[in-house]
Every structure is written in structure tokens, then in C-alpha cells.
């Protein structure tokens, strides 16, 4: 079972004040009942105190608009304040649970880049220039590669270069391509930051993060070998006649990313999602069919989001194994239980 993924504000209610007592009880309870844990590092959603104390840690769009807390992933990919706080939390978690018998695998962050895959703030701009210098070495080479003679965009100093922010008309496509490469590398660097901490403290515990199929902002081919296990979140639309084929392709891609090694289906819904214009329920047997499809394409783990429907929050209407009322007398529960027994 996956736990702790969005628990930062409970694990660290105030800067440097950690409270793991509730997680201790949960880890012990799960182990006592024969359940092993995919433990999230909780870094995907910083608590409000981070932005309150470090407003420059918030991401900025190409239009110059700051994205404020209230959802998730409200952090700049290059914020030193975010990285310092995230590293400290991951270190404390690893030191606390390194010997816990329930710990089976680490789940770093969550769906990197899903909502914020790039940031256009001044800190990110400086990081972009550094990345470009390491890539090209000289301004002459950068000007040649970018074709900056067109529209009189030749650069004479590195400081003149900015991210492809909103401009009067079409941006330079080569600049945009390098920006996307840079942003992907920035996401990977955040993953490396957490992975290095965990491998230092818990070298025998595998590390993973959940990829999202054909997600373009991150170069999964470059990223996958950094993880011990490749994991996938997949949410095909039950109302789409082509969903089964698309899901098959996503599963095949995930297997190839791990060079044929077994991979984890970390997230799928047991019934319906809550974020489409039309949130169609899976038909009877469809959850089993798509789970078996993943297994046939190399997965050795089938998991779900989420265990019990949330009582509040942005995903309170998302499907779950157990509904709000808490009963196990439902078609979804019976189908998931049957699948579990079948896979045993």
C-alpha cells in the first residue's frame, strides 16, 4: 500500500518541527497485518508555511503569473528553499524508517511535472543560462545553433538570454526545444536529489517514482535507469473506444523504459476519476481486464488510487476501493477482492 505521498504538512507542521507519531502507528499497524508499504517522501506538495516564508519558492508561468498554494506542486523547480526543506524531510524519513520491516520501497515525490513542469522566474532563468553555457560553451556556438540572426536576436552576453517567456509573436523554436530539454533535466535533478539521500541511508530499499505514460515534459528514457523500479500511473477513459489500445501502448512503453524488467502499475482507478468533463465509471469487468492487460505487458504489481474515498479536498469524488460510507458491500470492492484472490 502507498502512504504518505501528500503528508508533508502533517509530517512537518512547522519548519523543522517533525511529527512522525501517527506514521509510526500506521507503519506498525500495516506490518502487523501483513501489509508492506510503498512509502512516499511527501515532497510533491509543500505545506503552506514554505510559500509563506519563501514566496520566491513559488512557480511562475511564461506570462509572469505566480502560481499560489491551494492545489499541489506549488514550487519552483530551482528553488533553494524548496530543495533544502525537501532534502531535510527525506533525510528524516529515511533515518526514521530505515529499519522498519514494513518498508518495501520508496516512492519519491509524485508524478513529477504533472502540474508544474517548468518555471519562468528569474532563478530559473539563471539556471537556464548555466545549462546553456554547459551545453554550448560559447555564445557564438549558441547563436549558430539557435539561428539568432533571424529577427535580429543575436546574443552578445549570456545575461541577455531568457526563458521563452510570452513574446509579441512566435518564439524561436530552437530556444523552446532547449528550454524543454532544460526543464526535463531539472525535473530529473530533483528526483536525483531525493534518490541520492535514500540510497545513502537505505541502500537496500529500492526507489521509484510514478511515470505518466506519454508525458512529454519529462524525458523518461533518460530518467528510467536512475530508478530501481519503473512505475506507471494510467487512467484510460472508459468511454473512449480506443482506450484499450492506448493503454496497451503506454504499458509497452513502460516495460521498454525498464529494459524489459518488471514494472509497477502504481496508480489506476477502480471505478471513475473526478477530473474529466465526463467521469464515466468502468463497466463491470473492465478494471480486471485493464489490470490483466498491464500484467500481460510485464507489470508484476497492480495497485490503485485510492484506498478510501476522501471526505474532502480536490479529489473527494475520485473513485476508490472503499466509498465514503465505508462499506465493503459494493461492486467495486467485490471486483477488486476477486482480482486480488486471482493474482495470489
Label each region the model flagged.
Residues 158-162, 200, 204, 213, ...:
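Carbohydrate-binding surfaces of carbohydrate-active enzymes
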Residues 8-21, 48, 114, 212-219, ...:
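Acidic-and-aromatic substrate-binding clefts and catalytic sites of carbohydrate-active enzymes
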Residues 2-7, 40-49, 104-113, 211-216, ...:
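Short, solvent-exposed turn/loop segments enriched in Gly/Ser/Thr/Pro and often Arg
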Residues 6-21, 49-80, 170-176, 276-279, ...:
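Surface-exposed, active-site-proximal loop segments in enzymatic domains
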Residues 53-55, 60-229, 233-247:
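Polysaccharide-binding and catalytic clefts of secreted carbohydrate-active enzymes
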Residues 2-67, 91-94, 191-201:
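Aromatic-lined substrate-binding rim segments of carbohydrate-active enzymes
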Residues 2, 34-38, 102-107, 206-208, ...:
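Structural preference for beta-strand elements that scaffold enzyme active sites
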Residues 27-34, 95-101, 220-225, 253-260:
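Acidic (Asp/Glu)-rich catalytic clusters
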Amino acid at each position: 500500500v502507498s502512504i504518505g505521498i501528500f503528508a508533508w504538512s502533517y509530517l512537518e507542521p512547522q519548519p523543522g518541527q517533525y511529527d512522525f507519531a501517527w506514521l509510526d502507528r500506521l507503519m506498525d499497524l500495516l506490518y502487523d497485518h501483513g501489509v508492506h508499504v510503498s512509502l512516499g517522501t511527501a515532497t510533491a506538495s509543500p505545506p503552506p508555511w514554505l510559500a509563506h516564508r519563501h514566496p520566491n519558492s513559488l512557480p511562475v508561468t511564461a506570462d509572469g503569473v505566480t502560481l499560489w498554494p491551494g492545489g499541489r506542486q506549488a514550487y519552483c523547480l530551482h528553488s533553494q528553499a524548496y530543495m533544502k526543506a525537501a532534502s531535510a524531510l527525506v533525510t528524516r524519513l529515511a533515518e526514521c524508517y530505515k529499519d522498519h520491516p514494513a518498508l518495501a520501497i520508496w516512492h519519491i515525490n509524485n508524478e513529477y511535472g504533472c502540474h508544474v513542469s517548468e518555471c519562468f522566474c528569474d532563478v530559473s532563468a539563471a539556471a537556464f543560462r548555466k545549462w546553456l553555457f554547459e551545453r554550448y560553451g560559447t555564445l557564438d556556438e549558441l547563436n549558430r545553433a539557435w539561428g539568432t540572426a533571424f529577427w535580429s536576436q543575436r546574443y552578445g552576453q549570456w545575461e541577455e538570454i531568457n526563458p521563452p517567456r510570452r513574446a509579441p509573436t512566435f518564439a524561436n523554436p530552437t530556444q523552446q526545444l532547449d528550454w524543454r530539454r532544460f526543464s526535463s533535466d531539472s525535473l530529473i535533478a530533483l528526483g536525483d536529489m531525493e534518490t541520492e539521500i535514500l540510497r545513502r541511508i537505505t541502500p537496500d530499499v529500492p526507489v521509484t517514482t510514478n511515470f505518466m505514460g506519454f508525458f512529454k515534459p519529462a524525458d523518461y528514457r533518460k530518467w528510467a535507469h536512475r530508478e530501481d523500479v519503473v512505475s506507471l500511473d494510467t487512467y484510460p477513459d472508459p468511454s473512449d473506444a480506443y482506450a484499450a489500445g492506448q493503454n496497451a501502448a503506454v504499458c509497452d512503453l513502460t516495460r521498454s523504459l525498464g529494459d524489459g524488467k518488471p514494472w509497477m502499475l502504481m496508480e489506476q482507478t477502480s471505478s471513475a476519476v473526478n477530473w474529466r468533463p465526463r467521469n464515466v465509471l468502468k463497466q463491470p469487468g473492465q478494471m480486471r481486464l485493464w489490470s490483466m492487460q498491464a500484467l500481460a505487458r510485464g507489470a508484476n504489481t497492480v495497485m490503485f488510487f485510492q484506498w478510501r474515498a476522501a471526505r474532502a479536498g480536490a479529489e473527494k469524488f475520485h473513485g476508490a476501493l472503499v466509498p465514503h460510507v465505508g462499506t465493503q458491500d459494493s461492486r467495486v470492492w467485490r471486483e477488486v477482492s476477486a482480482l486480488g484472490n486471482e493474482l495470489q
